[in-house]
UniProtKB/Swiss-Prot annotation:
Keywords, in A-Z order: Cell inner membrane, Cell membrane, Membrane, Stress response, Transmembrane, Transmembrane helix, Transport
Protein name listed in UniProt: Glycine betaine transporter
Phenotype upon gene inactivation: Deletion of the gene completely abolishes glycine betaine transport.
Cytoplasmic compartment residues: 1-13, 74-93, 161-195, 252-263, 338-347, 423-446, 493-660
Length: 660
């Protein structure tokens, strides 16, 4: 009998889990023993990467956008992230709220006011502190927070959700490489990829926690006069982590989802307040103009490396942003994938790319232009000086110039805290997925990673290693960019196969045979109007008649030297024909609940008749939307052969295309 200790750790992937802990321990030891030398080394490496590989980042991010646009417009856009019959797990509003808060919600709070003013003071080109500099600052801010950022997230999220929900692979980064390395994803190579993604996620969240408490401290200092100290920042990290632990303990639906929805409501409230209490017409006009300039200059900005006027601006801003989004993409991409099951690929790309980007542009447009208006028209030099001195106070200094500044500063502080909580709890869920063998892990594993990230942030905060950690996180983006390019290759390859299968099946489509054996018309009518109210009746049919049909086919397939497996599932019976290196054939009969037709309700006048059950056919790609209940064994065998013939046609098309 296994011990309680062994069962408690049974769901841990030891290779990824232990490797992650060891790397974190080594990193902490270096930072604590030689903090100055390590910070200097990481800073120099970061500078070398941004100077030498800026062209590579620019081309890669542009390529990600092109790939997403191609997939969305192609026939692959109709493919679902899951079986063909699957439906979205979350409503559109809940889905968008979770995308927004996990992706960059906290960044908008930090940079919404500060970044446009920083570009206004120090633009990439031209004279600073002019009207042209103000226009350029908004255009650049839109560029950094717009389509490119969400394109990076979308590539990782799309690949993960496609392979996890469409092909039943683990929801892990390694699964994205399956078309390229096959079953090696389950070996050391896959463990290495997941370990790398885990380290990047932990470092990214820990950096956010460490630097984020600075903005929370600024809000508390403004509201209550609390002077920020190392002790107060440690206490804040502990409080935020405790709230994240509570959210994680409640789970994705009750905790993370509810918190994300609350965040979105409060963020919209703050944005509406700024819009109506600032220069409303000015904000509308400038935001619309900024959006037009952003769209019209999108291609130029995408490939602009400032090669003819070299300066450190692009490395300190655009390349830093691209590297930061890439380093966060395993974390955000996995979380987006986790909540996107059941959507079509086209719906997914449009949703992930356009909806959060639209909200981000509105937020940056209203907040950034409100800050610039305060400086340009109201002469608010204190805001300008505050941003130059400490960008974390920008939001609170701006709110000070508006009515009800105390109340709104309190709301802003609460929002910052909640955004940090959602980043921490989402990060813990993602790290838990990466280091566990399955998604059904105990709560203590998620809580453990909350403690690890909080402890890492506290130690580095006290030891002065947060800047080094931030540099290390950005540096990790370079090798992961190569992995993302491989992910694109594997995704396109898999989608091509899926699209070919859809086309081949369409070309070889046969109508379900239904009832072929001779029967009187009265018998046929009675059978097609038979709506079983009991699941037991359908289960009994599957266990008896479907089982016999499967066994008859099994004997014939084996006589022809094919490997066949019949297996019971939670909801039915499955027949699988093994084709070795090619895609296997699956015919699955499922006992499925469905709504009765309206005429049935009218005829029976029975309040209890709210549902009936059917024996629906599922193939590898999902439900086929026809019922085989009451078919004879011969009918079933003929239908299976029809479906198998379509599958063989698809395999022949694939062999012709690949030359095998």
């Amino acid at each position: 009998m296994p011990s309680k200790t062994s069962s408690r750790f049974a769901n841990i992937n030891p290779n990824v889990f232990v490797s992650t802990i060891m790397i974190i321990a080594i990193f902490l030891a270096i930072v604590i023993l030689a903090p100055d030398a390590f910070e200097l080394l990481t800073q120099q490496l970061k500078n070398w990467i941004t100077e030498s590989f800026s062209w590579f980042y620019v081309l890669s991010v542009a390529f990600f956008l092109i790939v997403l646009g191609y997939i969305a417009c192609s026939s692959s856009g109709k493919i679902k992230l899951g079986p063909d019959h699957s439906q979205p797990d979350y409503s559109n509003s809940s889905w968008f709220a979770m995308l927004f808060t996990a992706g960059m919600g906290i960044g908008l709070m930090f940079f919404g006011i500060a970044e446009p003013i920083m570009h206004y003071v120090s633009p990439p080109s031209g004279e600073p502190e002019t009207i042209l500099a103000a226009q350029q600052s908004m255009r650049v801010t839109f560029f950094h927070w717009g389509l490119h950022a969400w394109g990076i997230y979308a590539i990782v999220a799309l690949s993960l959700s496609y392979f996890a929900y469409r092909h039943d692979l683990p929801l892990k980064i390694r699964s994205s490489l399956y078309p390229l390395i096959g079953k090696k994803i389950y070996g050391p190579m896959g463990d290495a990829v997941d370990t790398f993604a885990t380290i990047g996620t932990i470092f990214g969240v820990a950096t956010t926690l460490g630097f984020g408490v600075t903005q929370i401290s600024s809000g508390l200092n403004y509201l209550f006069g609390f002077e920020p100290t190392s002790f107060s920042k440690v206490v804040l990290i502990i409080i935020v982590s405790a709230m994240a632990a509570l959210s994680v303990g409640l789970g994705l639906d009750k905790g993370v989802k509810r918190l994300a929805e609350l965040n979105l409501v409060l963020a919209v409230t703050l944005l509406a307040f700024v819009f109506f209490t600032s220069a409303t017409v000015y904000l509308l006009q400038t935001t619309i103009q900024n959006t037009g300039q952003y769209i019209s200059n999108l291609f130029e900005m995408t490939f602009n490396l400032y090669a003819y006027q070299p300066n450190g601006w692009i490395g300190g801003w655009t390349i830093m942003y691209w590297a930061w989004w890439i380093s966060w993409s395993p974390f955000v991409g996995m979380f987006i994938a986790r909540v996107s099951r059941g959507r079509t690929i086209r719906e997914f790309i449009i949703g992930v790319m356009l909806i959060p980007t639209g909200f981000t542009l509105i937020w940056m447009g209203f907040m950034g232009n409100a800050g610039l208006y305060s400086i340009l028209h109201d002469g608010n030099l204190s805001l300008l000086n505050a941003v130059q001195r400490d960008s974390s106070v920008a939001l609170f200094e701006f709110l000070h110039s508006l009515p009800f500044s105390g109340v709104m500063s309190l709301l802003a502080t609460v929002l910052v805290v909640l955004f940090f909580v959602t980043s921490a709890d989402s990060g813990a869920l993602v790290v838990d997925y990466l280091t566990a063998k399955s998604e059904d892990s105990p709560v203590w594993q998620r809580l453990f990673w909350i403690v690890v990230m909080a402890g890492l942030a506290i130690i580095l905060l006290l030891a002065g290693g947060l800047t080094a950690l931030q540099s290390a996180t950005i540096m990790s983006a370079l090798p992961f960019t190569f992995i993302m390019l491989l992910i694109c290759w594997g995704l396109i390859k898999a989608l091509r196969i899926d699209s070919t299968k859809m086309q081949a099946i369409q070309e070889a489509r046969t109508t379900p045979r239904a009832i072929q054996n001779p029967r009187s018309w009265q018998q046929r009518l009675g059978l097609i109007m038979h709506y079983p109210h009991s699941k037991v009746e359908v289960d009994a049919y599957i266990k008896k008649h479907v089982q016999r049909a499967f066994e008859s086919l099994e004997r014939e397939f084996k006589r022809r030297h094919l490997t066949v497996a019949i297996s019971e599932t939670d909801d039915g019976l499955q027949l699988k024909v093994d084709h070795h290196d090619e895609i296997n054939f699956i015919y699955h009969v499922v006992s499925r609940e469905t709504m009765p037709p309206s005429f049935m309700l009218e005829q029976e006048h029975n309040a209890d008749v709210e549902k009936y059950f059917q024996a629906e056919v599922f193939l590898r790609e999902g439900g086929q939307n026809y019922d085989v209940m009451d078919w004879t064994e011969e009918d079933l065998i003929q239908d299976i052969i029809d479906q198998y013939e379509r599958h063989l046609y698809f395999l022949s098309v694939m062999r012709a295309q690949t030359g095998n």
